[in-house]
From Swiss-Prot:
Changing residue 1038 to A: Localizes normally to the nuclear envelope of hyp7 hypodermal precursor cells, however hyp7 hypodermal precursor cells exhibit failed nuclear migration. GO terms for biological process: egg-laying behavior; locomotion; nervous system development; nuclear migration; nuclear migration along microtubule; post-embryonic development; protein localization to nuclear envelope; regulation of cell migration. Residues 986-1041 form the KASH domain. The chain crosses the membrane at residues 1005-1024. It comes from the Eukaryota. This is Nuclear migration protein unc-83. The gene is unc-83. Residues 613-626 have a biased composition (Basic and acidic residues). Disruption phenotype: Viable, but with failed nuclear migrations in hyp7 hypodermal precursor cells. Hyp7 nuclei are mislocalized to the dorsal cord of L1 stage larvae. Its main location: nucleus. It is a single-pass type IV membrane protein. GO terms for molecular function: dynein light chain binding.
Amino acid sequence: MDVMDSFSEVEMPNDISSEDHLLKVIESSAEEVDIFLENCSSLYNLILDSLHNLTSKTISCECLDEMTSTLEKSAKKILAERPEAENSVLLRLNTICCAMDQLRVQHNSRMMSGADSDTASSARSSTSSSTGEMRLWLHEVERRLEINEKRIRVEPNLQLLLSDQQALQLEIQHEGQLLVNRLNKQIKDDHDSDSSEEEKRKTCVDAIRKRWHTIYLNSLSLVCRIEELINHQQASEDSESDPDLVGPPIKRARIRTVGHLTASDTEESEADEEDRHSQTETVVTEDDNVLPFAENEYESIMDGRVTVDSCTSSSEDQMVEQSTNKKWESVLQDVGYSSGENSIHEALNTCADHLVPETSDMRRKRIECSPVKAFYRTVQLEDMSDLEVTKAINHDVEEEPNLSDSMYVNHDSTFLATQNLPEYDEVMALMDDDDLPMDMSMTESFNTKWREIHGQKKPLRRASRPSREQMNLIAKSSCDASSEDSSEGENQTNLEDDPEMMSVSFNSAQFDTSSPLKRQRSARGLKNASFLYDSLEMDGSFCSTRSEMLPPCKTRSLARRKLRVRRMPRSMSDGEQLGVVSSKPEGMMTPMIRVSPPSTPVRRLLRKLDEQIRNRDSDTAPEHSDAAQAYEWDEYNPPQKDDSISDRHIQTMTDISDQLMNIDDDFAEHFGTSSAIRLIEESKSHLRVVLKALEESDSNIPQLSNFELIARSNLRQVDEALKIQSGNQPSFLETSTLQDLRSEWANLYESIRSPFARIMHQVKKFAATLQEVSSMASLGDVDIRSKEDVAKTLDAVTAIERRLSSERQELRDLLASSSFRDVAKDLSCEFESVSEGYDDAVDKIGKMAHSLSQVKGEWDAWNSRQNDIRNAMVRIESHLKEGQMDNKMIADEMELCQERMNSLETMCNYLTASLGSIQNESNSKNLPDFKAELSIYSNALARLKDRFNDMIRVPTPPTVQFHPPEPLPSLARSMTTQTAEMESETENEPLTIAEAISSSRLIKFTFALSLLAALAAIFYYHVFGKPFGPHVTYVNGPPPV
C-alpha cells in the first residue's frame, strides 16, 4: 500500500504538468485562430475600401495579393494544427478571394478605360502586366512538372501520381489557353502608332505561346511515361503470378503405412511436420485443409481399394478379412510433369497385373456408400492433394502397387484384374514400331538414358511453400523431364495437322477406354515466333500507329510468358526449338535485325521483335524463385548427323548475302503465301495512294518528305521479302511480282528524292502567288465605309506583303543553291524574270499598304479632332449658361475652335481623295460623306459665335437710339450682323482724355483718393514739424561739413 501511495505521489506531478502543457498548446492554437480571423477581417475591409474608393490613400493590388498569400500560408498551418477550425478558416478565405477577384476586374477595367491621350500607355502597361502574370504561371507550372518527375522515382502509388499529373495537364491546357487568348485580345485592341514597339510585343507573345506549347508537350509526355510504368508494373505482376512461369509443381511422394498407425507414430509424424514447417517459416492454418463434407465421410483418393467404415456389404467384409495379414509398400512414383512425358515409365510398370479381383457389384456398392463420389469425378488429384487428410486404416493389406498421381479419378468405370490396359499396349506398340515416321529431333529425344524414380519413405504433408530440404530430396529422385519437352517444339510441326493429338496424350478416348490415365496436355502452341506474326505484322502499314500495331498489356504479358524458356535443356541440340539457328556457314549465334528508317512504325515494331526474340533465344532459363530447381542433367548421346543434310543446308544458305539479317527458322514457314500476298496488296495500295497524291498540285515540301519516308519503308519491306523468298522458300512466291513492285518503288523513291521535283513544286507555288498578286485589282472592289473596313483591308494587304517577301527570299535562296545550278542551269534567265516580278509585286503591295496605313492614321486623327471640337464647344456653352462673362477666355476658345475647324476641313479633303483613289469608280459613290459632318460642326460653331456676340453687345443711350420699324423674320440674321458691325465700329473710334475721365467712375475715384492723401501729408508736416516719410537720425551727431 505504501508503495502504491509513493508511486501515485511520484506520478501525479507528471500528469499535472502534461495536462498544463496540453492546455497551453490549445490556448496558443486558439490565439492563432483568433489572430487569423482578425487579419482576415482587416484585409477584407481594406479590399472593400479599395473596391468602393472609400479611402484617400490607395493600396495597390500587388500589396493586397501579397497579404492574401500570407493569409493562405497561415491558414494552411492552422488547418494542420487544428482541423476542427476548417469551416471557419475556409469560409473567410473564400470570401477574401472573391473580393480580390472583383478588385482585379475593377482595376483592369480602370486601366483599359483611361483617357484618350493615355490609351497607348495604359494598353502597354496592361499587356506587360498580363505577360508578367503569364510568365509567373509558366514558372509555377514548370516547378510542379519537375516535382512530378521526381515523384516518379520515389512514388509507390503510381495511380495517385497519374491522377495528379492528369489534373495538372488539364490545368495547363485550359489556363494556358485563357491567358494566351487574353494576351492576343489586348494586342489586337492596342493599335500603337510605333510599329517597332508593336512588333516587339507580338514577338514576346509568340515566345510565351511557344513556351506554353513546350510545357504542354512535356506534361503530356510525362503522362505517357507514367502510364507506361503502370502497364509495365501490371505486366510484371501478372507474370509473377502466372503459374506457367514458376517451376513445375511439387508432386506429393507416396507413403506407406505398416500395420496399425499408433498414436506415437502419429505424434512423431506431426512433430516432424511441425519442425519442418518451423524451418521453412510456413504457416498452415485450419482453413487450408477444409473439405466440403464431414471428416468421417472422407475416403482417401490414394486408397481406391479400401472400403469405407459406413459400408456394410458382406462381400467387402470378406475381402477385408482375407487381406488382414497384408501390408502396404511404397511403389514407383510419378513426380514428372502432368503433360504426358512419363507415359513410357508407366507403360513399363507391370503393377496392374497384381491388382486384387473386384467385381462390378462390389465396386458399385462401395461407390453408393461414399457421399463424395460426385466430388471425386470432377476434381483432379493434384487439386485434391492439397486438401487431403489421410485416414487411419484399421487393418493390414497385401503389398499392392498404386497408380500414378497424374490421372483423373473416375470410379464409375469397371475395372477387371484380368483385363490388360489398352493404353499400355498402344504405347508399347508406338515404341516398337520401327516404321513410325518421326522427325530427326524426335529420334534424338529418345536417346536419353532414363533413370528409375524411387518414392519417398517418409510421410510428408504438402505445405503452401516447399522447403529447401524438400527440393533437394526431390531433385535426387527425379529425372530430367525436359528431354521430351525440349524436343516438343520440333515435333509440333507434325502435330499441328492433328489438333486431337495436340490436346490429349496417347491414353485418350480414341483407344476405346473411359479411364484416361494422364491429364490432357495444355493447348500451348509452339515456343517460336508464330504468334508474333499473327498479331503483329512485320510489314505493317505506314498509316498505322503504335497503339494499333502493338498488342494490349495483357497480350504482351502472355507473349512474354510464351517466349520465356521454362525448362533447362540438356544440350544445345535440345535448345534448337528456341530459334538460335545460324543462317551462315560460320555459325553466328547472335540474331540480328536490320534497322528500318528512323521515326517509322516499322522501326519500332522491328525493335520490339528484336527484344522479344533476344529474350526467347536465351540459352538458360531464368530463375523465378530462390528455391532450388528440381532439374537434373543426365547423360545424352546424340546420334551421328547425316552429312548430306548439312551439305544441302550449307549450299542453300551460302546463296544469301552477308547483309541479310539472321532470322528464326520458323519465320519462312509462317511467312507463307497468304502473308506474301497481303504484303504485295498493301504495298500496291500504298503505291497508288502516293502516286495520286503526287499528281495533285498542292503538295508541299513536308508532304514530299513524308512520301519519301513511305517509299523508303515500302522499298525496304519488299527487299526483305525478296531476300527471305530467295533464301528459304524459292517456290512460294513469284519473283517477278516482287521485283516489279520493287522497281516501281525504287523509281518513285528516286523521283521524289531528286531536287528537280522540289524545284518544280516551288516554281508552281511562285507562279500561283504571282497570279494572285496580278489580280490585286480586286482590292478596289472592297466597299470601305468605316474605319474597321480600312483596318481589315490593311491586315489583308500586310499578310500578302509578308507572304511575297518570304517567297521572294525562298526564290533567291533557290537561285543561289548548287542543286538548282546543276538541274535547271538553262532556266536561270526565266527565273531571274520571275524574281524581278516578285520585286515589283512587293513594291506595289508595300505602297498600297503604306497608303492604307496613312488613311487609317488620318481617320483616327479625324475622329480625335472631332472630339476636341465637340468638347470645346460644350465647355463654351456651359460657361455661357452659368453667366461667367470672361470674354477673353471665351474668345480664345472660339479662336482655337476655328483653327481646329480649318484642320478638320483639310483632313476631310485628304480622306475623300485617298479613298477615291483606292477604290473603283463604282464604289466611290458609297464613300463616307466627310463634308456633311464638317458642315454640321461649322454651323454649330457659327451659332455659338452669334450667341456670344449677343451677350457681350453694349446698348446705346435711349435719347440717341433710333427705333427702327419691326424687322421681318427673314431679316433677323442680317440685322444681327449689322448691329455687331456697328458696335465694332464704335469700339474702334479713339476717345479724348476728358471724355474718358468723365465716362469712367474708376478714374474719378482714384483721383479723389490721391487728393485726400496729399492733404493728410501736409497736415502731418505742420503738426509734427517733420516731413512725411522716412528720416535719418545721427547717433554721434551730424557729420562734419
